[in-house]
Amino acid sequence: MAIQSKYSNTQVESLITELLAVLEKHQSPTDLSLMALGNCVTHLLQNKVPAEAREVVTEQFAKALSQSVKNS
């Protein structure tokens, strides 16, 4: 999603691979997978992002997600 990241491609790809493996293990259909991942995002935003930054971080995340879907 990000043009520049403080994380290596290896770190990102490893995490993605593990997350997708869990969804596959549970034979999760696309809608359930998106619901679960969305709930994970909500949990992270509510518990790991300071309240005063949540709106901006949420907007940045949504914009990056939208752009990544358009560019694929």
From Swiss-Prot:
Protein's UniProt name: UPF0352 protein swp_2271
HAMAP family: UPF0352
Organism encoding this protein: Shewanella piezotolerans (strain WP3 / JCM 13877)
Signal peptide: none
Family label: Belongs to the UPF0352 family.
InterPro entries documented for this protein: UPF0352, YejL_sf
Taxonomic superkingdom: Bacteria
